[in-house]
Amino acid sequence: YMRSRFLEPCQGQERWRKWALQRSAILTERIDPIDAVSQSELEGCEDADALRSEETFRKSILQTAYFYLGTQYRWGGKTAGGIDCSGLAFMSYFRNGILIWRDAAIKEGYPVHEIPIEQAKPGDLLFFPGHVAIYLGNGKIIHGTGHPESSCVTVNSLWEGEPGYREDLKNSLCAAGSIF
């Protein structure tokens, strides 16, 4: 994966690091155990690729998305101060070293390719008209929504009878995409 560079570890908090964001903003994030392993420690390790396996990467995408849970909806936003659907997808991938476009549709040249909806796995993206969400598995999604009932990053279900079920989303689901 293309790994982004961070500014510096946070003083006195070795499990946290700082990232430079747009317009001189600084983002502080917790380092997961995979990121805590230095490149020199991975050299010569036969299982280095296993440490950054697809499953591990997918889990990390979800952990990053959950960081924003409850963050207020803000059209065009991509920070903990306010975020929209494509901002959540973008930041969840970006903070894990993958640059995807901030778009709510799969377009030619987009780093995410279309897959059959029924083959979506946790960490893949689900697309709706003008909207994108991260698939959690078991019919659940996490997304930044301006919906009147929950104008924030929230978890909803596409399965009737489940908590957080949104019929409008179930009925308008139009595509799924994956980087794998």
Go through each PLM region and give its residues.
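A structural motif
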Residues: 54-64
